[in-house]
Amino acid sequence: MGSFGMLSRRTLGTDMPVMAQIRSLMAELTNPMSLAQGVVHWQPPQKALEKVKELVWDPIISSYGPDEGLPELRQALLKKLREENKLTNSQVMVTAGANQAFVNLVITLCDAGDSVVMFEPYYFNSYMAFQMTGVTNIIVGPGQSDTLYPDADWLERTLSESKPTPKVVTVVNPGNPSGTYVPEPLLKRIAQICKDAGCWLIVDNTYEYFMYDGLKHCCVEGDHIVNVFSFSKTYGMMGWRLGYIAYSERLDGFATELVKIQDNIPICAAIISQRLAVYALEEGSGWITERVKSLVKNRDIVKEALEPLGKENVKGGEGAIYLWAKLPEGHRDDFKVVRWLAHRHGVVVIPGCASGSPGYLRVSFGGLQEVEMRAAAARLRKGIEELLHHGMVE
């Protein structure tokens, strides 16, 4: 005992969560300002919180619920999926966040040794979900250099040439960490490529409402497609841990397999969180879009802070809550830059190496209100200018 040789090779081979490393870094600092974690600055709707407050003493809140989720929440989600996402043939399972939804799907769809496809820069938690479940052949495809959109031509070649065919392709739309989005024609083409190849497509729609400058989010539906959604960012419910899976109602046995996984991880999402979600949905998507509008100013503030890197080196800001910035040549060790920015300038961001892209930074503009965002951006700009002109001065 006490030897690493006694621990699971799967977990030993899984990346350390970057946010756990960032939290440790922040604990070393005095008054750091975080542009790191993907959070929003608002809380759930006040009316919804007031209703939940009245339920705290109800014994049902402390009980287990159906594995798939409360019936009233699932019905509300089906209505939302039909009306807003145009998903008319889907069923849903409620999960303890979108990350847990993704893990459920990986365990349901993949066997150890299967190959899967992601696109660079990828969402680090999804990559880790594959690692920890024994999916060791993770094929990482390129994003287009000018847009970071998934390269569909590369995907078509890869799926046709790989033997056996990869089991799953996954995309995040809009992108985390890229802050870009997948236009509808491209998303439909990716879906068709996956269908023709006989592989699953998982689309993470966590940031579905976070679209800017008139751009529109869209979903695709099919028997080979599974969509993942989240309440965390939309309704400011990060700590309430609630997400859901939308899958084709025509898939025989799929729900049964999901229940097996669900019953052995959370059993069910927290009942009080599900009740809050029911009440939050009553506020409608307009409640979300009003708050997302406030992020446009934040995005522009952070973009301005990143200008010294050159506009061609800053991508994203089309959707989600992220900008994706390329560091100057000679600074490929992005985690070293992150630590330096934190200790020298008191601002914290995420290294691109966590998403398979050394030499980049992910900068979140969702977690602070405008006044604080300006202060954090000022620290970031000062740090970047010093990095460019003098290097990492101690």
UniProtKB/Swiss-Prot annotation:
Traits of the deletion mutant: Suppressor of sav3 mutant plants leading to rescued hypocotyl elongation in response to shade and restored auxin biosynthetic pathway. In continuous white light, elongated hypocotyls and petioles, with increased leaf hyponasty, decreased leaf area, and accelerated leaf senescence as well as early flowering. Increases levels of auxin (IAA), indole-3-pyruvic acid (3-IPA) and the ethylene precursor 1-aminocyclopropane-1-carboxylate (ACC). Indole-dependent auxin (IAA) overproduction phenotypes including leaf epinasty and adventitious rooting.
UniProt cofactor(s): pyridoxal 5'-phosphate
Variant or mutagenesis effect after changing residue 179 to D: In vas1-2; suppressor of sav3 mutant plants leading to rescued hypocotyl elongation in response to shade and restored auxin biosynthetic pathway. Increases levels of auxin (IAA) and indole-3-pyruvic acid (3-IPA)
Outcome of mutating residue 77 to F: In vas1-5; suppressor of sav3 mutant plants leading to rescued hypocotyl elongation in response to shade and restored auxin biosynthetic pathway
Entry EC number(s): 2.6.1.27, 2.6.1.5, 2.6.1.88
Tissue specificity field: Expressed in roots, cotyledons and flowers.
Molecular functions (GO terms): L-tryptophan:2-oxoglutarate aminotransferase activity; L-tyrosine-2-oxoglutarate transaminase activity; methionine-oxo-acid transaminase activity; pyridoxal phosphate binding; transaminase activity
One annotated Gene Ontology cellular component of this protein: cytosol
Residue(s) carrying N-acetylglycine: 2
Entries under Gene3D superfamilies matching the protein: Type I PLP-dependent aspartate aminotransferase-like (Major domain) (3.40.640.10)
Pfam families, A to Z: Aminotran_1_2
Binding site for substrate: 38, 123, 176, 362, 374
InterPro entries reported for this sequence: Aminotransferase_I/II_large (IPR004839), AspAT/PAT-like (IPR050596), NHTrfase_class1_PyrdxlP-BS (IPR004838), PyrdxlP-dep_Trfase (IPR015424), PyrdxlP-dep_Trfase_major (IPR015421)
PANTHER family attached to this UniProt entry: AMINOTRANSFERASE CLASS I_CLASSII DOMAIN-CONTAINING PROTEIN, ASPARTATE AMINOTRANSFERASE
Function: Coordinates and prevents auxin (IAA) and ethylene biosynthesis, thus regulating auxin homeostasis in young seedlings. Shows aminotransferase activity with methionine; can use the ethylene biosynthetic intermediate L-methionine (L-Met) as an amino donor and the auxin biosynthetic intermediate, indole-3-pyruvic acid (3-IPA) as an amino acceptor to produce L-tryptophan (L-Trp) and 2-oxo-4-methylthiobutyric acid (KMBA). Can also use tryptophan (Trp), phenylalanine (Phe), and tyrosine (Tyr) as substrates. Regulates tryptophan (Trp) homeostasis and catabolism in mature plants.
Family named by the database record: Belongs to the class-I pyridoxal-phosphate-dependent aminotransferase family.
Subunit field text: Homodimer.
Name recorded for this polypeptide: Aromatic aminotransferase ISS1
Taxonomic source organism: Arabidopsis thaliana (Mouse-ear cress)
